[in-house]
Amino acid sequence: KSVYTFGSPRVGDGVFAEIYAERLGSKTYRLTHGRDVVPSVPNTLLGFRHVPTEVYEDRNGNITIGDGSGEWKGGEDHVWRRYSVSDHLYYLGEYICGCNS
């Protein structure tokens, strides 16, 4: 059994992230895509941290597995980037924010 999240914001402080990593880190995959804005909030200056492990999908669909730290930033899209709301709407080539009927 595993936990998969798509475009998750930071949800706890450093202590939370450490405890989470000890208990579920090897079973958690936190997918991020391109320049998705949501994983960048709340800011780390406020004490929030990501849980591991990031699985980064670039805008061409290439996948990179993170280094196991919650705050790893994969790919060139993560370096002083402009954030994108539209990158939050698509993961693994699928529209994830609504129903298509």
Locations of regions flagged by a protein language model:
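Serine hydrolase/lipase
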Residues: 1-101
